[in-house]
Amino acid sequence: IAEFSDPPFRGDVAPNVFPAYYLILKCWGRRFDYFTIPGEKALGCYTPYKSRERIKIIPQGFDLNAVKRRPYEPNPQPTFAYAGRFYERIRDPRFFFDFLETLDADFRFDLYINCLDPCFAEMIRQAQQRVRGRIVLREALPRERLIERLGAADFLINFDNTTSNATPSKLIDYAMTGRPILSFNDRTFDPDGFRAA
């Protein structure tokens, strides 16, 4: 049995993937009787490598008792947070950082990034210099501590994937904080709605 969390590369996400990669995946897939995936949305990403009846959907598990939830206390300045990774053409936040430069208000945006690509590190560095509020790059934390920290924000940011083949597992963690979640990507972002939040 092979377990997946994120789908393998597809042409809509990574059009320049080495062509033999798909053949390698298909050969590799033959070594397993079944694939398990966390959600039905991603099914089409796996059927080129394994027949539908050999793909089982098993949602990701979590232990709610392992999470300590603090009582919410409003922050002195609007504070919002994001946890996860950024990916070019999939989960690219440049539009949001450009928007933050237009805000004429104090705020704090906490970023918990577990792996930061150089292009996004530079984007964050430049934005930190240009915004009126603060953008704070925090260290990656173990899941339970991260959920507790996220619960101290006024609200959470989820950058929706531009592809529809996966749902970020961070939404489970976000929901466990009890904080409001604003989800959007560059096509669905509403600047006026954000200002009202």
Language-model features and meaning:
Residues 13, 61-78:
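Acidic anion/phosphate-binding donor-loop and adjacent secondary structure
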Residues 77, 113-115, 121-145:
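Nucleotide-activated donor-binding/catalytic signature segment of Leloir-type glycosyltransferases, i.e.
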Residues 33, 150-165:
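Acidic donor-binding loop of glycosyltransferase active sites
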Residues 41, 60-61:
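Carbohydrate-associated surface elements
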Residues 27-30, 142-153, 176:
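Short acidic alpha-helix that forms the nucleotide-activated donor recognition element
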Residues 8, 17-35:
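Membrane-proximal helix-turn-helix segments that form the acceptor-binding/catalytic region
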Residues 73-90, 97-101:
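Conserved donor-binding/catalytic core segment of Leloir-type glycosyltransferases
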Residues 2-16:
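A short, histidine- and acid-enriched strand-loop-helix "catalytic/donor-clamping" loop
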